[in-house]
């Protein structure tokens, strides 16, 4: 991988894996760190940046931190783990935060926050331990388009455990 750096036992910067963009300019630091997309940084034991063809610019820092999709940031132990948001643009900071997400353009700060966001969940902010989990946002704004679809989300959850199981748009908890 052009201009790639891998430091640590089993640290890898992948090139041309089926369905994954070459990780040119990728950096992998740590035991089993794995940079799979271009211009990405995977740092920590088992940290991984991955996605589909054309994905780039991801950062995963921490034991088993994980990003899937372009421009994603996951910082903290197990942050972002199990996420499948191909559009990316999610930011998660805190242990066990931002896990199993399918949504895009979301921010989660705090341990265990911003988990299990639905496929159409976009532009949510969760601040605090366990805030903003299981948001569904099932309806959209007719006049607001993101990537060709209706805009869903716009929920703000501040405080420990706030905003759980929200369903709809423009909620503040």
Q: Predicted regions: what is each one?
A:
Residues 1-173:
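Glycine- and small/polar-enriched repetitive beta-structure motifs of secreted/surface proteins
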């Amino acid at each position: 991988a052009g201009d790639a750096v891998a430091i640590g036992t089993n640290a890898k910067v992948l090139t041309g894996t089926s369905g994954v963009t070459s990780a040119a300019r990728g950096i992998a630091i740590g035991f089993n760190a794995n940079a799979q997309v271009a211009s990405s940084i995977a740092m920590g034991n088992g940290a991984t940046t991955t996605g589909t063809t054309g994905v780039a610019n991801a950062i995963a820092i921490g034991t088993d931190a994980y990003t899937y999709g372009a421009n994603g940031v996951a910082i903290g132990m197990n942050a972002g783990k199990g996420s499948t948001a191909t559009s990316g643009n999610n930011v998660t900071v805190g242990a066990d935060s931002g896990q199993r997400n399918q949504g895009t353009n979301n921010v989660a700060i705090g341990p265990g926050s911003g988990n299990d966001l639905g496929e159409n969940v976009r532009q949510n902010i969760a601040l605090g331990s366990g805030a903003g989990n299981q948001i569904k946002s099932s309806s959209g704004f007719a006049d607001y388009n993101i990537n060709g679809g209706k805009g869903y989300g716009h929920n703000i959850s501040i405080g420990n455990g706030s905003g759980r199981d929200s369903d709809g748009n423009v909620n503040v908890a």
